[in-house]
Swiss-Prot record:
A motif (Q motif) lies at residues 187-215. It is an enzyme of class 3 (hydrolase). Residues 218-418 form the Helicase ATP-binding domain. Residues 1-43, 88-167, 676-699 are annotated as: Disordered. The keyword Membrane does not apply. SMART domains: DEXDc (SM00487), HELICc (SM00490). Keywords: ATP-binding, Helicase, Hydrolase, Nucleotide-binding, Nucleus, Ribosome biogenesis, RNA-binding, rRNA processing. This is ATP-dependent RNA helicase MAK5. CDD domains: DEADc_DDX24, SF2_C_DEAD. InterPro entries: DEAD/DEAH_box_helicase_dom (IPR011545), Helicase_ATP-bd (IPR014001), Helicase_C-like (IPR001650), P-loop_NTPase (IPR027417), RNA-helicase_DEAD-box_CS (IPR000629), RNA_helicase_DEAD_Q_motif (IPR014014). Residues 451-616 form the Helicase C-terminal domain. Residues 125-136 have a biased composition (Low complexity).
Length: 760
């Protein structure tokens, strides 16, 4: 009987009692990770404090030295006492084994449960048991997930490094073998004494011969001298300092650098290149990467500019060989890390591109902070060490004359500074390794490119939009860059010209970084033979190397002469030709005269010495006024439509701001009362009234204006052709019959712009 009862009991236990007990065990195991550890008050001396590193560039610490920090501790103030509460028990470190929880009241139940669980591993499993077994403690599942994740991550990193080695090794060598026949003849580069790897990369870039600035500066830089290089825009200044930097990197033992990174230390970059604008920094990065693309092993080049992730840039700087950046973001990253600023003090090259802009008075304070941080005196146990002693300083720009930075408008002395005065100005701003750096000026007579033709269009102040549209229509298949002095002008001109069905792209400093890069990419990716127009502020004036820009139009007279030089330098780059047109209003005559006098003073002086009467440097562009007057109605309609859209957006933003401010103050907001109170007849009242009229324009009125404009754009402008006798030879009849697009009916050669490109 005993045996039968025991068998019956076991059957009952297996069918009825096992599942509740199993739930109980699993419930207990499930509840253990959720249970919070008891907190306890500990003494401050028993905590694991660690010292805080204070940045070296911290000017005034005011006694904040020897700081220490601790993590995972709550600070509670109890009256006048401060208590430190931690959740980590002290016995947790000492006893690593299982904790003794006492004897269980039913010790056999756990063994039975374990036995049943062992049996339940057979294929036939009840549904309830499957569900219960899938439920595991969160802590255990988390640990199980973390371990394979870390292992996979390590495997990916190792495989990635192996793949990179293969890619930069064998595949790069194969690519080099395949592309040797496609390269250009680089025999003229041989006198510069470059390595075979660099010569091969130059051949793949198809640069047959060095430019004047490259031939003059590369040997001096390779010899270890500090160099100040001056050359016209588009003369290849980027490779003038990029080639020696890569040569130096190739000569340095790469195994030492890889070992240093493997030990967890921050890598010391070989070169730091400073740029005034983000677009120029990204362009410099691309040019150096293109130079290194043909090498078997290439340096890691990274750009540090605003508008992108700071944390990602910090990670890139720790392994970078060549750093290109703007002063603001670069100083933000360097000043936050003591290791980075110490590593950057060991750079071999400091390059300042567009130095006249970076070193101008009242601008780029961060650049000054970077120079001081690199030259900061360190006091060690062994003695005093000055950082950055061994580095070369390379300075490049198209304009070094300090007099070109003076404003053209207003009263004041407009005398030109000499080369010696400009050099003294640079010596004050930068600390060169040599007492007097090598000053190389390959075009001392003129700052303008040789293939550039300059023209001026005189018009009324209120007709600039009309003449700008006329000039753009006269270049239907050319890539045009329009410069303005203000962001508001870019925002106004872009929608107006878009209403006139022109492919217009905007670029200014208040756009987010991705939008700025997208605008430059869209402008550069336009097909040759198709019109592409970029309206930009001076952010696009310096350094941007966009091939195929045929015409540069200055909507406003630049504020300074050096801005005009760099704006005009976006065209006629290298050996190509280009056209720079200045739209001048009557009130801009005085600044224009000063501009021409400053930019072409050296060329005029040289002409007088030779006994010549002095040539005309800026030609007057005579447009056909009849054709311009026929375009007036188009421009007026497009301007009304664009102004209405902008006024509604602007007033909507102002209303939102005023309404939000009124809500924060707890005041009732009534826009009509504010408008009545703000009505005045003083300066600016006319502009306010026009904005109000544009805002009150209804959708039906805007649609009517768009319909009128569409009808006008569908018709061609008659350039003097008798429409009764259209086949007299002045009209392309085949083009009309085939439906070819065009804005003019008749020939447009006599408009006064094209002959400038052919004049000498």
């Amino acid at each position: 009987m005993t045996t039968d009862t025991t068998k019956q009991k076991r059957k009952l236990d297996s069918k009825q009692n096992t599942s509740p007990k199993r739930r109980k065990v699993q419930a207990n195991g499930k509840a253990q990770p959720k249970a919070k550890k008891p907190k306890r008050v500990v003494a401050a001396d028993s905590l694991s404090w660690r010292s805080v590193e204070i940045p070296e560039l911290f000017d005034d610490a005011e006694g904040f030295f020897g700081l220490e920090e601790v993590e995972g501790v709550d600070v509670i103030r109890d009256g006048g006492m401060v208590k430190f509460v931690t959740a980590a028990p002290a016995a947790e470190k000492e006893d690593e084994g299982d904790d003794f929880s006492g004897f269980d009241d039913n010790p056999e139940s756990t063994s039975l449960v374990a036995a049943e669980e062992a049996k339940s591993e057979e294929p036939a499993k009840p549904q309830s048991q499957k569900k219960q077994q899938t439920k595991q403690p969160k802590s255990e599942t988390k640990e199980k997930k973390e371990k394979p994740a870390k292992a996979k991550k390590n495997e990916k990193q190792t495989s990635k490094t192996d793949d990179d080695d293969l890619a930069t090794g064998s595949f790069a060598a194969l690519a080099e073998i395949d592309e040797t026949d496609e390269g250009a003849d680089v025999s003229e580069w041989e006198p510069l004494g470059l390595s075979e790897e660099i010569m091969s990369s130059i051949a793949k870039l198809k640069f047959a011969k060095p430019t004047a600035i490259q031939a003059a500066t590369i040997p001096e830089i390779l010899a270890g001298h500090d160099v100040v290089g001056k050359a016209s825009t588009g003369s290849g200044k980027t490779l003038a300092f990029g080639i020696p930097i890569v040569e130096k990197w190739l000569s340095i033992n790469a195994s030492t650098q890889s070992k240093r990174v493997a030990e967890g230390e921050t890598k010391t970059p070989i070169a730091l290149v400073l740029s005034p604008t983000r677009e120029l920094a990204h362009q410099l990065t691309d040019h150096i990467k293109n130079l290194c693309a043909g090498l078997a092993t290439s340096p890691y080049v990274c750009s540090v500019t605003g508008g992108l992730s700071v944390h990602k840039q910090q990670r890139q700087l720790e392994k970078a060989d060549i750093v290109v950046g703007t002063p603001g973001r670069l100083w933000e990253v360097l000043s936050s890390s003591t290791k980075l600023i110490q590593a950057f003090r060991g750079i071999k090259f400091l390059v300042v591109d567009e130095a006249d802009r970076l070193l101008s008075e009242g601008h780029f304070k961060d650049a000054k902070d970077i120079f001081e941080g690199l030259d900061k005196v360190e006091t060690d146990d062994d003695g005093i060490i000055r950082g950055g002693k061994a580095r070369q300083t390379l300075v490049f720009s198209a304009t070094f004359n300090k007099g070109l930075q003076q404003k053209l408008a207003g009263k004041g002395r407009f005398d030109l500074a000499t080369d010696s005065q400009s050099m003294e100005y640079l010596l004050k701003k930068l600390k060169f390794r040599e007492e007097i750096p090598k000053f190389i000026d390959v075009n001392p007579v003129s700052q303008m490119a040789e293939g550039l033709k300059e023209g001026i269009v005189e018009c009324g102040a209120m007709e600039k939009d009309l003449y700008l549209y006329s000039l753009l229509l006269m270049h239907p298949t050319q890539r045009t860059l329009v410069f303005t002095n203000s962001i508001s002008s870019v925002r106004r001109l872009t929608p107006m010209l878009q209403q006139l069905t022109l492919p217009v792209i905007a670029l200014h400093s208040q756009m987010i970084q991705k939008a700025r890069l997208r605008s430059v990419e869209r402008f550069t990716s336009s097909k040759p033979g198709s019109a592409s127009i970029l309206i930009a502020t001076d952010v696009a004036a310096r350094g941007l190397d966009i091939r195929g820009i045929d015409v540069v139009i200055h909507y406003h007279v630049p504020r300074t002469a050096d801005a005009y030089v760099h704006r005009s330098g976006r065209t006629a780059r290298a050996d190509s030709s280009g056209l720079s047109i200045l739209i001048c209003a009557p009130e801009e005559v005085t600044p224009t005269r000063r501009l021409v006098a400053k930019v072409h003073a050296s060329a005029a002086a040289k002409g007088k010495k030779k006994g010549s009467a002095g040539g005309v440097f800026v030609h007057s562009v005579e447009l056909d006024r009849r054709l311009v007057s026929k375009l007036r109605e188009r421009v007026q309609l497009a301007k009304q439509i664009a102004d209405s859209t902008l006024a509604k957006e602007k007033i909507g933003k102002e209303d939102n701001w005023m309404q939000k401010a009124a809500e924060e103050l707890g005041v009732e907001y009534d826009s009509e009362d504010l408008e009545k109170a703000s009505n005045w007849s003083g300066r600016g009242s006319g502009r306010k009234s026009k904005q109000k009229e544009a805002k009150e324009m209804s959708k039906a009125e805007v649609a009517s204006l768009k319909a009128q404009l569409k009808q006008l754009l569908s018709k061609r402008i008659n350039s003097g052709v008798n429409e009764r006798y259209i086949a007299n030879g002045n009209v392309d009849i085949d083009g009309l019959l085939s439906g070819a697009k065009g804005d003019f009916l008749g020939k447009v050669e006599g408009l006064g712009v094209s002959p400038l490109l052919a004049t000498d």
